[in-house]
Design a protein with these regions (language model features):
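Solvent-exposed, flexible loop/coil residues
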Residues: 5, 155, 208
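Bacterial N-terminal signal peptides that target proteins for export
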Residues: 2-13
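Bacterial Sec-dependent signal peptides at the C-terminal "C-region" and cleavage site
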Residues: 21-31
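Bacterial N-terminal signal peptides
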Residues: 12-22
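Contiguous hydrophobic, core-forming segments of folded domains
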Residues: 103-170
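Intrinsic disorder/low-complexity segments
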Residues: 1, 20-22, 252-256
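Acidic, serine/threonine-rich low-complexity disordered tracts
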Residues: 29-123, 171-267
């Protein structure tokens, strides 16, 4: 994938308004006093091997998810990752999280993979975190989701799956009234368990979420998945995933981006 390292993107007021349309209800959470240790099956271990042989460690007691705001903290800062496989092996990938301005009092943020794409995220005050839309900086398109895609589900127990069906609309970035592609995605998130993860930034206790995507967007038939490890107070410490939905449309469908945290931000 060709990457041009641009650090900023200017978004006019009209574009911000379109991006921030369409919000959904919060997800309620609850707690428990015991947690099960779950060993990964072979197919999951094989998929995670792209991270490197010593990244995924022992299973830990896995409790119900009750603090998504801590597992994916939304605070301003910069995080750095190292890509561990593929054409960009060894490349440093920088991520910046910033508060979104002009949001009429709503708690909205944007997360930018520098030079690649920007995600717009909502936080409802009760821990529910949702993906509203994203901008592909290479292809100059905006992708919007109706309803929004939950990134984390409070209350999930080990082995639980949550499924969301969403309408996907892809617009031209510089003419957000021009609909280029439309389709539907069924997104399933499964809480696999808790695991010790060792990355260049340190050793962390994490929860592992497996995601799967099935559907059709424009000419692209989507059957794919990914894995993300979250650590409390840090966010994503390792992942094997396709970085954004428009990758299905414009890039090699087999390409995923495994990465590990090398520098944490937002402290």
């Amino acid at each position: 994938m060709k990457v041009s390292w641009r650090n900023k993107i200017a978004l006019p007021a009209l574009l911000i308004g379109i991006i921030l349309m369409g919000f959904s209800s919060p997800v309620v959470c609850e707690d428990a006093s015991t947690g099960a240790m779950v060993e990964l099956n072979k197919s999951d271990r094989d998929a995670l091997a792209l991270l490197g042989g010593r990244v995924v460690g022992k299973a830990l007691p896995a409790f119900p998810i009750r603090d998504t705001a801590e597992l994916m903290p939304l605070r301003e800062g910069k995080w750095a990752y190292r890509i561990t496989a593929g054409e960009r092996t060894g490349t440093r990938q920088e991520t910046a999280i910033s508060k979104t301005k002009g949001n009429h009092g709503q708690d909205l943020w944007h997360r930018t993979i520098v030079g690649d794409f920007t995600e717009f995220i909502s936080l409802d005050g009760k821990g529910a975190i949702n993906l509203i839309s994203e901008i592909d900086l290479e292809q100059n398109v905006i992708t919007r989701y109706t309803p929004m895609l939950p990134i984390m589900f409070d209350g999930m127990k080990t082995g639980d799956s949550s499924q969301v069906e969403t309408v996907v609309k892809v617009y031209a970035l510089h003419d957000p009234t021009h609909l280029k592609y439309k389709g539907q995605l069924k997104v399933t998130h499964t809480y696999l368990g808790a695991y010790e993860i060792t990355v260049p930034a340190g050793k962390y206790e994490t929860v592992l979420i497996r995601s799967s995507y099935v559907g059709k967007v424009g000419p692209a038939h989507v059957v794919d998945g990914g894995y993300t490890f979250y650590a409390r107070g840090v966010g994503i410490v390792a992942s094997v995933e396709r970085m954004h939905v428009t990758a299905f449309l414009f890039y090699d469908k087999r390409t995923k981006t495994p990465k590990v945290l090398i520098q944490r931000g937002g402290s």
